[in-house]
UniProtKB/Swiss-Prot annotation:
Chain ranges of the C-type lectin domain: 75-181
Organism phylogeny: Eukaryota, Metazoa, Chordata, Craniata, Vertebrata
Record keywords: Cell membrane, Disulfide bond, Glycoprotein, Immunity, Lectin, Membrane, Signal-anchor, Transmembrane, Transmembrane helix
Tissue-specific expression: Constitutively expressed in monocytes and macrophages.
Cytoplasmic domain ranges by topology: 1-4
Protein name: C-type lectin domain family 5 member A
Any single biological process term in GO: negative regulation of myeloid cell apoptotic process
SUPFAM superfamilies the record matches: C-type lectin-like
PROSITE patterns: C_TYPE_LECTIN_2
Length: 185
């Protein structure tokens, strides 16, 4: 008998079992479901009206689907659409809503890197707004943004990403392209 071949085969089997165990152990933690709800505030003059008086529920980071509509980019179970037309932040939100999506919530480093790679040299609105009453940035799902925004000033309550590879404050009334996001099917 060739003991070297048998031992090599056993080592390969053990490594496969260990690898599969780690995969099954960490898969739910990496791709676990996080449901959040968004309820817009109705304070005129602070940030744009997002969805009127309706509530919107969606899962911003998780989906096990793999199919996106034509013209959308797939990343980690989500579909992303980069508009070619420029609109105000409110009109960008409405544009995404008509496509069954929302402005992108860039809440992981992987998603940020992916969007920076596909956005090129353009600036795109995302779903991040400054809340002057709270003096903090919030995503449209009402979660707090813990990063930093460049060039924030009095009337720059919306955010773009793209050209500079950073989160840049922008006027909500200036026209930019937008990034829409929804679950893959």
């Amino acid at each position: 008998m060739n003991w070297h071949m048998i031992i090599s085969g056993l080592i390969v089997v053990v490594l496969k079992i260990v690898g599969m165990t780690f995969f099954l152990l960490y898969f739910p933690q990496i791709f676990g479901e996080h449901n959040v709800s968004f309820s817009p505030t109705e304070r005129p003059g602070t940030v744009p009206q997002i969805f009127g008086s309706s509530n919107v529920s969606f899962t911003p980071t998780e989906s096990f689907g793999t199919v996106c509509p034509t013209g959308w980019d797939f990343h980690q179970g989500r579909c992303f659409f980069l508009s070619t037309s420029e609109n105000s932040w409110n009109n960008s939100m409405n544009f995404c809503k008509q496509k069954g999506s929302t402005l992108a919530i860039v809440n992981t480093p992987e998603k940020l890197k992916f969007l920076q790679n596909i956005s090129g040299a353009e600036k795109y609105f995302i779903g991040l707004l400054y809340q002057p009453a709270e003096k903090m940035w919030r995503w449209i799902n009402n979660s707090v943004f813990n990063g930093s925004v460049i060039s924030h000033s009095h009337n720059f309550n919306c955010v773009t990403i793209g050209l500079t590879k950073t989160f840049d404050a922008a006027s909500c009334d200036v026209n930019y392209r937008s990034i829409c996001e929804k679950s893959a099917q």
